[in-house]
Amino acid sequence: MRLLILTLSLITLAGCTVTRQAHVSEVDAATGIVRLVYDQAFLQHAHTDRYVSRGIADRACQQEGYTHAVPFGQPVGNCSLFAGSLCLNTEFTLSYQCHHSAFPVFL
């Protein structure tokens, strides 16, 4: 019986995980900072592909004259939609630092 409950719980929780594609929200050419964002709805566990996000940040840096982007910090979540005291949508921000280099660093 425990195995059945555990299996059903895992199947239910796995259905709540979604992959989101981050998009550019801010590019500061002076400081070389690129910020990408993606949303996570209530009762979801959203994540983004780090390789794809890095490519998006690289392209944004290249448009500003840099060669590549390096991720820094942790994703920062901010509630973007409230219903009373309940957060219905969280916006996650990923930060990247643009660099000039002949040899890009792959992390």
From Swiss-Prot:
This is Uncharacterized protein YecR. It comes from Escherichia coli (strain K12). The gene is yecR.
